[in-house]
Structure formats: C-alpha cells, structure tokens
Amino acid sequence: MTPPSTGGEATPVLVLMVALGSILLVSASNWLSVYLAIELPTLSLFILVAQKRGSGFSAEAGLKYFVLGALASGLFLFGCALLCGLTGGTSIPCIDLVLNQGRGPALDPSGVITPIGSLLITGALLFKLSAAPFHMWAPDVYDGAPTTTTALLATVPKVGVFSILVSIGPVANVLLIATIFSMVVGALGALNQTKIKRLLAYSGIAHMGFVLWGIEIGTFESVQASLIYMILYVIMSVCAFAMVLALGGLKNLIVEFSGLSRKEPALAITLALTFLSIAGVPPLIGFFSKWWILLSGITYQYYLVSILAVICSVVAGVYYVRIVKIIYFQADSFFLVGLKTLREKKRINFRKSLLIGASFYLMGFMIISPNLLLQLAHWATVGLF
C-alpha cells in the first residue's frame, strides 16, 4: 500500500511561485498586475504555512493567515476599484499623474474617494509587511508555521511590497502612524516572549517601522536608506532563521540556546553576533542601517520620531542581549536537560552550513566594504523613482 503524501513534493514549486510573484511585483506598474503579483506568493504561502501534517499549530497558523490575508486582499481590490473607477485607467503612473496634476478635484468633487482608495491600498500593503497596527497575525503564524516557511514569509514577499509602497508614496501620514506603532509594538511586544520565532516576529515588526519611516520622509536619500535597511534585514533574518533551523529545538524556546557556547562554539558566536547586529549594536552592520535612517529623519526634522526610534532600539536591545546571555552564561535547567536527552543529536548538513556561512559572510563583508551595497542601492532607488 502506498503511504499517503505529506505534501512536501510541491514545496519547491510553491517556493518558486513566491519568488516569481515577488519579482513580478517589483517590476509591476499596473494595479491589476500588482494584485496578481501579490496574490501569487500569498496563495503559495497559505499552503506552505499549513502543510505540516498532524500539527494543530500549523493548521491554526494557516487558517489565521488565510482569513486575514483574504480580508486584506479584499480591501486592496476595493481600493484599486475606487481609484481605477475614478480615473478610468489601471496604470499606476497614469493614475498618479491624473490625480496630482489638478484633475483630482474635478473627478472627485467630494474629495473622499481618492483618500479612501489610497488608505485601503496602503492598509492592505502594510498587512503584507506585518507592520503595526496590521501585525496581529504575525506572531501566531510565524510560531505555528514550519521554520523554513517562516523564514520565507519574513523576507521575500516584503521586498516586492516595499517597491509598491515607494511607487505610491506616503498617504495622509498613514506611513508615519504605522512607523510609530511598529516601533513601539515591536519593541515592547518581544520583551515577554519565550519562543524564538515569536520574538523574531515582533523584531520584524519593529524593523518594518524603520523601513516605513524612510518611505514616509519621501526623499531620494531616505528611500535609499530604507532600501539598504530592507536588504540588510533580509540577510540578517536569513542568517537567524537558518541557525534556528540548524539547531532544531524541540519547542523553539529561547532557553534552549543555553549552554550552546560549550557545545557548538562556532554556532554560538555566529548566533550572538547575528542577534547583536539585528539589535543595531556598533560596529556591526545593523547599526549602520539604523544610522542611515536616523540621519535622514534628523536631516528632515523628524526629531520626535528620531528620539522614539532611539528609545525603542534601546528597549529592543534588551531582549537581544538576553539571548546572548542565555547562550554564554546560563546553564541548562533539569527540564532542558531532559528535552535535550530525548532529542536525537543531528549534524548540521552542508546546505544549512552554506546558508549560514554565506549570509554571515555578507554581514561581515558589508562592514568592511559597504561601497558595493551603497552603489547597488543607489541604482535600485533611481529605478524606483
């Protein structure tokens, strides 16, 4: 009798669909193509999140992501319908040109349809970025999904959504409000977390606050700084999730890292430096990404937001330093000793080692020679503008 399929055979195809949708989203200039490019990775991620057979957490995560994702897609379509119906076209540059060249009041005498449509579209895109106040799904979905799917969900789709947000620009200070909420929620929400993937979910929310801040400022330099921040966030997240996957904790608890420095010293120092970089501790690369965003904010007189960003970064640094403390200075409890005794010890395979090594090398290389990253970000920002 043939054993039932676990669904793993379709995983490579679904991952490629996520990558394809994100690539198409970066190059899309029509609202219909934007919608299709957003839904292609979203539908693939619905399946990937819930594909862990026999896991109630995975099924719950998939259901939450499906329901809330469908709601966000509906809001996005409604916003597109309002703008396209108002202007008679679907091209993003043409719609912006019509609404910004003096014909907006003639087409929309009430002055209500245009801002409502823009708000609905922006809100749906903020959901895809897991930015506050549209972040409620992220911790549960990140925790319930398989680690490889969580890493994919936390990185690849956000790059394409970033490009669309840059194209439509800031809308009625919505991005500024999302920036403030994301920084505060991300910093405070992670303080009491005991699971590493939930902590990384709140960390991602806080980082999206910095990315949105650069888009809200709206200048070439600030968008370039946001793009650099997004690239470095993706690299650091890939390294962090790869190490979580390689360590293979039974419960994905943060305290499972205790004693790692004695058993796997190379992994311990890599994990510690990665989390310190995510925290923005100098002279690691995460510090420079935050510095460039802060510099843009101060240059354009966002003083209060700059102070809030510094405070939230300090608060967020507490739980990253706590992880380093657990890695180096905390002994195993009896509960953890029992868990690790029951767990079969696995060697890290070549693919995971290569992924960890490549991402960590990029983090180190960009500290020594950031010129290549700055030049690539400059060219990419020119294309976005």
Curated annotation (Swiss-Prot):
One of its GO terms (biological process) is ATP synthesis coupled electron transport. Coiled coil: none annotated. Belongs to the complex I subunit 2 family. Its EC number is 7.1.1.2. It is found in: Mitochondrion inner membrane. Core subunit of the mitochondrial membrane respiratory chain NADH dehydrogenase (Complex I) that is believed to belong to the minimal assembly required for catalysis. Complex I functions in the transfer of electrons from NADH to the respiratory chain. The immediate electron acceptor for the enzyme is believed to be ubiquinone. It catalyses: a ubiquinone + NADH + 5 H(+)(in) = a ubiquinol + NAD(+) + 4 H(+)(out). It comes from the Eukaryota. InterPro entries: NADH-Q_OxRdtase_suN/2 (IPR010096), ND/Mrp_TM (IPR001750). It is a multi-pass membrane protein. It holds the Pfam family Proton_antipo_M. The chain crosses the membrane at residues 12-32, 34-50, 66-86, 112-132, 161-181, 200-220, 227-247, 268-288, 291-311, 354-374. Keywords: Electron transport, Membrane, Mitochondrion, Mitochondrion inner membrane, NAD, Respiratory chain, Translocase, Transmembrane, Transmembrane helix, Transport, Ubiquinone. One of its GO terms (molecular function) is NADH dehydrogenase (ubiquinone) activity. One of its GO terms (cellular component) is mitochondrial inner membrane. This is NADH-ubiquinone oxidoreductase chain 2.
